[in-house]
């Protein structure tokens, strides 16, 4: 399976660079992982059209006044989402990728103190400890989406809408890489 994946932008001494969490290589072991550059001039349409799954990864912020916000990444991801939807690709959102997909498809995110932690979600009759590294929760999800997991405070942590599945946590940073079965398209 070919999996195209967005990357976080990290600012370092000599300028920005794209980065991908090492956990994705073990999470998607046995599949071809294709990183998507955060510059439209280097993006190739066939990165999406030739892929079986498009992953919108975590990292950076969706909040424009946050120092970790990156406009160039947002532009690339909007383009990738438009192509993915046009070609009816399977889509997986992880953490910030879930926030991006939620907002892009009509939902919203809201600030939440104390959410940058490991915490428990309830999904498919199981209680699973997951890892979150953001300061926001989902205020609402896209119309027609099904809730797959909630935390103990009742916040939605995972949803699915047709061929789009999202988790608000970081499965790539968990030993089990756990996600609800309904959206484990790479297995």
Q: Which residues make up each language-model segment?
A:
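N-terminal beta1-alpha1 cap of cysteine-dependent amidohydrolase-like domains
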Residues: 1-96, 103, 110, 115-127, ...
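Active-site-proximal beta-strand elements of phosphoester/diester hydrolases
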Residues: 129-130, 165-170
């Amino acid at each position: 399976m070919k999996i195209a994946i967005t990357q976080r932008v990290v600012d370092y001494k000599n300028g920005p660079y794209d980065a991908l969490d090492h956990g994705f290589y073990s999470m998607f072991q046995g599949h071809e992982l294709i990183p998507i550059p955060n510059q439209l001039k280097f993006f190739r349409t066939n990165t999406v059209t030739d892929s079986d799954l498009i992953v919108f990864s975590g990292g950076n912020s969706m909040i424009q006044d946050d120092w970790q916000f990156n406009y160039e990444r947002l532009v690339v991801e909007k383009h990738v989402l438009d192509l993915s939807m046009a070609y009816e690709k399977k889509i997986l959102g992880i953490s910030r990728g879930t926030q991006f997909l939620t907002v892009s498809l009509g939902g919203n995110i809201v600030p939440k103190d104390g959410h940058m932690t490991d915490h428990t979600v309830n999904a498919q009759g199981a209680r699973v400890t997951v890892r979150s590294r953001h300061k926001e929760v989902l205020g609402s999800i896209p119309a027609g989406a099904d809730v797959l997991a909630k935390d103990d405070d009742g916040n939605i942590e995972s949803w699915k809408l047709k061929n789009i599945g999202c988790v608000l946590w970081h499965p790539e940073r968990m030993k089990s890489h756990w996600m609800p079965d309904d959206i484990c398209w790479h297995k």
